[in-house]
Curated annotation (Swiss-Prot):
The lineage of its organism: Bacteria, Pseudomonadati, Pseudomonadota, Gammaproteobacteria, Cellvibrionales. Belongs to the ClpX chaperone family. HslU subfamily. Pfam families: AAA, AAA_2. ATP binds at residues 18, 60-65, 252, 317, 389. A double ring-shaped homohexamer of HslV is capped on each side by a ring-shaped HslU homohexamer. The assembly of the HslU/HslV complex is dependent on binding of ATP. The keyword ATP-binding applies. This is ATP-dependent protease ATPase subunit HslU. It comes from the Bacteria. GO terms for biological process: protein unfolding; proteolysis involved in protein catabolic process. GO terms for cellular component: HslUV protease complex.
Length: 438
């Protein structure tokens, strides 16, 4: 679990997301409170429940990006889901309890990766011995044993230096579990995975011989040896505990399940989904293939654009379970400028790196960046406002000719205001063209 302070979390998010300080502060405090809760006395710890967050803001301003970056920072079980994928219990589709099942599966995967990383060195040593056994015939006498020992050291040195990577050897390794594809109706994924696990366990313990290059064999044997060193029962217990105590669920597009006054037809995936989410967010026990999971201390962060609805259109009970409200601001031309240059691996850096592979040197001048930002902002204002995502469209159209005409020769392209006007002038000013092309 992350031990970063709120200030450090915001500083890390600043590297990738421009502005939106209120939202960053809210998620940073919520993440830090997870750590703070684990430090208090156990009797009080169970009484401290997470304060769930509702992020409100137009599309393309950074709501989903905050979730993506938070997942990497949290170092805790984390899952991001779309509210629109769920239907209420009794209808075809996924029920909301599958969120918790996926969270637990993700937690087990996270802990398995951490454990495998810890015992990686021991696993590599064991894999090395198995490859040397395959490369060298067994000794038949004590004299041969001594000779084999020195030969083994020579081969070990060659193996570590990569001289034997392309040599093909025959090794005995664990048999691949039987692959059984089961087509099940939506909403029955849990039963499907249990059936697949049952068929997989039927082939466990069996081995097979395979011919592989030393490089591929070393990787497969390292993974196999690492898996042997892991205590699966202990790992599952720790992963379930982490999911219950430190798990974070990010529910995107929550506004799409609000009831609309002018909507006709059954609200299968709307109010019903909200009512199903209530016990999950309030705290209940969910049955999974790994056992019963309590959701009392899982942190829920919901987000939505609320273009066609308002947060007050959510059912009152759900509003009460999302006590912290954060409003994200619409992006200005200045924000677009910063998005193009400031974040790590910014859009301009990505395009420069891609074209550099073919000898094209791409340079962006300050007035060029400004003009790109203004163009994206103007198109957003005149057509649909899709926020920072508009920059992807504008940049792709701007550099289309440069990307198409590369032929391996060294070329220098300077993207200034004149270049932008030449490539995008007509598209940006003609509303019909910008609506369908940009």
């Amino acid at each position: 679990m992350s031990q970063m302070t709120p200030r450090e979390i915001v500083s890390e998010l600043d590297k990738f997301i421009v502005g939106q300080q209120a939202a960053k502060k809210a998620v940073a405090i919520a993440l830090r409170n997870r750590w703070r809760r684990m430090q208090v006395d156990k009797s009080l710890r169970n009484e401290i429940t997470p304060k769930n967050i509702l992020m409100i803001g137009p599309t393309g301003v950074g709501k989903t990006e905050i979730a993506r970056r938070l997942a990497k920072l949290a170092n805790a079980p984390f899952i991001k889901v779309e509210a629109t994928k769920f239907t209420e219990v009794g209808y075809v589709g996924r029920d909301v309890e599958s969120i918790v099942r996926d969270l637990v599966d993700g937690s087990i995967k996270l802990f398995r990766e951490q454990e495998m990383a810890k015992c990686r060195y021991r696993a590599m040593e064991a894999a090395e011995e198995r490859i040397l056994d395959a490369l060298l015939p067994p000794a038949r006498s004590s004299g041969e044993e001594q000779h084999e020992s020195s030969t083994r050291q020579i081969f070990r040195k060659k193996l570590r230096e990569g001289d034997l990577d392309d040599k093909e050897i025959e090794i005995e390794m664990a048999a691949t579990p039987v692959g059984v594809e089961i087509m099940a109706p939506p909403g029955m994924e849990d039963m499907t995975s249990q059936l697949q696990n049952m068929f997989s366990s039927m082939s466990s313990g069996k081995t097979r011989k395979a011919k592989l290059t030393v490089k591929k064999a070393f990787k497969k044997l390292t993974d196999e040896e690492a898996a042997k060193l892991i205590n699966e029962e202990e790992l599952k217990a720790q992963a379930i505990e982490a999911a219950e105590q430190n798990g974070i669920v990010f529910i995107d597009e929550i506004d799409k399940v609000t009831k609309r006054d002018n909507a006709s037809g059954a609200d299968v995936s709307r109010e019903g989904v909200q009512r199903d989410l209530l016990p999950l967010i309030e705290g209940c026990t969910v049955s999974t293939k790994h056992g019963m999971i309590k959701t009392d201390h899982i942190l829920f962060i919901a987000s939505g654009a609320f273009h066609l609805s308002k947060p007050s259109d959510l059912i009152p009970e759900l509003q009460g379970r999302l006590p912290i409200r954060v409003e994200l601001e619409a992006l200005s031309p200045e924000d677009f400028e910063r998005i193009l240059t400031e974040p790590d691996a910014s859009l301009t850096e990505q395009h420069q790196a891609l074209l550099a592979t073919e000898g094209v040197s791409l340079a962006f001048s300050k007035d060029g960046i400004r003009r790109i930002a203004e163009t994206a902002f103007d198109v957003n204002e005149r057509t649909e406002n899709i926020g920072a995502r508009r920059l992807h469209t504008v940049l792709e159209k701007l550099l289309e000719e440069a990307s198409f005409n590369t032929d391996g020769e060294s070329v220098e392209i300077v993207v200034d205001a004149a270049f932008v006007d030449k490539q995008l002038g007509e598209l940006a000013t003609n509303e019909d063209l910008s609506r369908y092309i940009l």
